[in-house]
Amino acid sequence: MALKLRRNDEIIILTGKDKGKKGIIKNILSSNKAIVNGLNLVKKHQKPLPSQNKNGGILEKEAPIQISNIAIFNPELKKADRIGFRFEEGKKVRFFKSNKKTIK
């Protein structure tokens, strides 16, 4: 089955510390995880690397989140929605299940 979420989709977090927050998918990983801009931040302790001119310290980094814990955000209804597929003019397109509108 095709993966229903894609890069640059506006999503909402369903569970976890960032529950209810909205963001944009930055990257989809092959392990059914996604990286969302500005959400699910973790602190990473980085050693300085003088050879690469990188400073050390405690950095905040976006961690991957399970795809099952996020849902696409329907801006018309202002809530989470499910995605379906259908064919329009010979092309497979995604649509919101609640109001049957095509996802751009």
Curated annotation (Swiss-Prot):
Belongs to the universal ribosomal protein uL24 family. PROSITE patterns: RIBOSOMAL_L24. The keyword Ribonucleoprotein applies. Part of the 50S ribosomal subunit. One of two assembly initiator proteins, it binds directly to the 5'-end of the 23S rRNA, where it nucleates assembly of the 50S subunit. HAMAP family: Ribosomal_uL24_B. GO terms for biological process: translation. The gene is rplX. One of its GO terms (cellular component) is ribosome. One of its GO terms (molecular function) is rRNA binding. Keywords: Ribonucleoprotein, Ribosomal protein, RNA-binding, rRNA-binding. It comes from Buchnera aphidicola subsp. Schizaphis graminum (strain Sg). This is Large ribosomal subunit protein uL24.
